Regions:
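ATP-dependent adenylation/nucleotidyltransferase module used to activate substrates
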Residues: 1-166, 177, 186-187
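AMP-forming adenylation/ATP pyrophosphatase catalytic core
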Residues: 21, 133-370
Length: 370
């Protein structure tokens, strides 16, 4: 290819189309800006394995139809890629392992990490496409001083999705485009209406795609063929106060559905998976100051060399809280919040910020009162 031919080539973009309004508008924005777009939807589950009828999930057969219709309206190539085997291995199997070990996993973060920004980037490269584009509400920018790629919050605070993207690496960020990061949801829907997209008024997906009804314990039993046995509810003093229906069915901080009459509200405070016990207590028992994390990914800095003031989230929609982060060995850190936080939970992500910039994050391994 000559230099003239190379510079005249329009950049190519793989659009990860979920069938929702956000990724559809992301595709339209990239096409408007001069990119040669190819729409791709990942098939992650089989119809017979997951019943999504009437539920707001993603990547269902209905979503594939919607994505294909938008791609047709835009006159762009469109493909469905079958990732069901890898999705089961990397997402579903891990989801079950973490729950069975007593944690609370976040499969949407793992899906971004292993599927969207790994498999799709490799597919894009193999097909000569320069970028992978998604409909996430976050921003990617390059720091002129350091040359590092930065992940920033989306301007729409109510839709910001930077928390679920903290695992993006420098190599990935260099090829990722997030055109909705500077828009508000209302603007996105307005564009979809103007373009007469079939999904302009479609509800956002709200649940885990392979557990759309939210009953993850039933899904796990159906998927594995196991039965999770009943066990003892204990109070914080170790005394039996009732019988639960299987420790995997409960999450830290849960109040509803316990079936206990103890004269005052009680919450799930701890689980012992080997003993199959669930400890309940007053809400005050849920608050912890120290969080330990591993599987760390740094974005704004190459590594953590010493204590650093940050703000942090231990849940998706939590307002960031002030804290200090300390190195704690290879691929790990210790985070000390200024004030105790409610129910930080092993298995969930803890994401660190400085202003609107994502510093990095990791997976919570344990918590402590401090």
């Amino acid at each position: 290819m000559t230099e003239t031919q190379n510079t005249s080539r329009r950049p190519g973009a793989l659009i990860a189309m979920s069938g929702g309004v956000d990724s559809s508008v992301a595709a339209w924005l990239m096409q408007r800006d001069g990119f040669d777009c190819t729409g791709v939807t990942m098939r992650l589950t089989r119809n017979e394995a997951v019943n999504t009828e009437g539920l707001h999930t993603c990547c269902s057969e209905r979503d594939i139809e919607d994505a294909a219709e938008v791609a047709y309206a835009m006159d762009i190539p469109y493909e469905v890629l079958d990732f069901t085997a890898d999705f089961q291995e990397k997402i579903i199997d891990k989801f079950i392992r973490v729950y069975e070990a007593g944690g609370t996993p976040n499969p949407c973060i793992d899906c971004n990490r292993y599927m969207k920004f790994d498999h799709l980037l490799r597919w894009a490269e193999a097909h000569g496409l320069d970028h992978v584009v998604t409909g996430h509400y976050a921003r990617v920018e390059q720091d002129e001083a350091t040359g590092r790629w930065l992940l920033k919050k989306g301007l729409d605070e109510n839709k910001d999705q930077s928390y679920v993207l903290y695992n993006l690496t420098q190599e990935q960020l260099a090829h990722v485009r997030l055109p909705l990061g500077s828009l508000h949801k209302s603007e996105v829907r307005a564009i979809a209406e103007q373009q007469h997209f079939v999904n302009a008024r479609k509800h956002d997906s709200q649940d885990i795609c392979f557990v759309p009804d939210g009953d993850y314990a039933r899904f796990m039993e159906d998927f594995t063929g196991k039965h999770y046995p009943a066990g003892d509810f204990l109070d914080v003093g170790g005394r039996k106060v009732g019988t639960h229906s299987g420790a995997v069915r409960y999450t830290i901080g849960q109040r509803k559905g316990l079936g206990l009459a103890m004269g005052a509200p009680v919450y799930v405070c701890a689980k012992d998976m080997q003993a199959n016990t669930v400890t309940v207590g007053p809400e005050s028992e849920l608050f912890d100051t120290i969080v330990y994390a591993n599987e760390v990914n740094w974005i704004a800095i190459p590594e953590l060399k010493g204590p650093l003031r940050v703000t942090a989230r231990t849940r998706y929609h939590q307002t960031e809280q002030p804290a200090t982060v300390y190195p704690a060995g290879p691929d790990s850190f210790r985070l000390e919040f200024d004030q105790p936080q409610r129910a930080p939970t092993p298995g969930q992500a803890v994401v660190l910020y400085q202003g609107d910039v994502v510093l990095g994050g990791g997976t919570i391994t344990q918590v402590a009162k401090g």
